[in-house]
């Protein structure tokens, strides 16, 4: 006798999607019970996008839906109830309660406390009547005294708090939401909302939300068969929410493209109020496969006044953005170097900055240099024993560049500067520094249109992305190098 999920969808003919999800609520604890009860026939509740598409198709509300579909339109499938089966991802989600009133689609998925094959009679599923009762109660609440769209928007903003009272943890207690509203109003009159201890004040001014996604890519490349190259992406989502009210509620969704790399090891700010269990259990220790959770990643929270990090995450991308090799060897008094870099074809070729630093420790100042560079320009800092290869904002069309040269140094006795305890002898590296704006290696982005704000006023929402290199090293393949772990190759 519980509900797995509830949706309110505005039917919008003529738009690309045909509708917009105005409200959705999932109950993870009920979902876990569904896994146990339904066994091998369990079908998870889909995200809003796939559910919206499947529901509009089943209800024949898509603008371009002109063809006859036997599984839906044949005489043997005439629907005499408001119960449907939705085909989502090749699986059949049943039962789904849905009906259309006043251009608003009301939908819910009740818990079936028994096996789904064969389908049990509807009269034996108590959650069906509960789902219908709740949806009708929501409809009555939205349109009982609604005069215009502003009133409707105001009532929609009250639904999260009302469902906490009327349907906690997916169990319906009272379908009359007006009773819950009266109860909340009574509490607000007798016990004014307290300022939380972690929030030092309230904001007054223009409403706005800023979301910034920064990904740092780390890499250690050795150019050796017996040592595996390593790379990892570490992301941070920073937010600044200027919203009026003591406890405004915001929900931000992080999305991935079809070929995006799933987010893992997600750590959230304490202001986040709830999370899908799939987000919490996604770990880099597990092997990434097609079944890995790939979003949307929804974060409902009550923001503090100051800028804060909403979450941190890692991701295992297939390849590093720039592949490189570094060969350095001593030839008498001279040092010969060769550096090759290749930008992976999947990476945006538009840098704010891209340069390679080639330091020479424990050798003294550079006295002579002969070099050949296929692209960019080379700057020489003789006293610092440093070469800086300025690549610029783009790689050439071939995506490959190279640098070769011969150097000599002036030995200053035992006081050679700069000094390093690791880069002794031929142990040396090239360090890449680059930054790409409006881009992430995982493809992660914040959809501004899916941000839900339950506060007074309509905020201006802005989103930013950037990829930054961090500890991006290419070690000399002709010498030993420090490694975090060795490969398991025989």
UniProtKB/Swiss-Prot annotation:
GO terms for cellular component: AP-type membrane coat adaptor complex; cytosol; late endosome; late endosome membrane; lysosomal membrane; lysosome; membrane. It comes from the Eukaryota. The keyword Transmembrane helix does not apply. GO terms for biological process: endosomal transport; protein transport. Residues 206-476 form the MHD domain. SUPFAM superfamilies: Second domain of Mu2 adaptin subunit (ap50) of ap2 adaptor. It is found in: Cytoplasm, Cytosol; Late endosome membrane; Lysosome membrane. Its main location: cytoplasm. It is a peripheral membrane protein. Keywords: Cytoplasm, Endosome, Lysosome, Membrane, Protein transport, Transport. The keyword Cytoplasm applies. As part of AP-5, a probable fifth adaptor protein complex it may be involved in endosomal transport. Probably part of the adaptor protein complex 5 (AP-5) a tetramer composed of AP5B1, AP5M1, AP5S1 and AP5Z1. Belongs to the adaptor complexes medium subunit family. This is AP-5 complex subunit mu-1. It comes from Rattus norvegicus. The gene is Ap5m1.
